[in-house]
Amino acid sequence: MKAVITVIGRDTVGVIARISGVCSELDINIEDVTQSIMQQMFCMIMLVDLSRCSVPQEEMRRRFAEVGETMRMQVNVTRQEVFDAMHRV
């Protein structure tokens, strides 16, 4: 299963490292990533493969939420099908 991880918040050092670190800890493969900084706001979208994730989805979401809280950023994990449906015109 694929998912989209979005990260939004005030730019700070180590955002990509911390999010990718959680991915590594949970055996989540990062397939694509894009990020930009708009007026000191950091925005990142990661496409990830959850097929080898080592924990249940609830635990995975909790781990990303915790990292987001410590960085004071919003981190969301959305299944790719849901993300695609939400952004289809």
Describe these PLM feature segments.
Residues 1-89:
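A conserved regulatory-domain signal marking ACT and ACT-like small-molecule sensing domains
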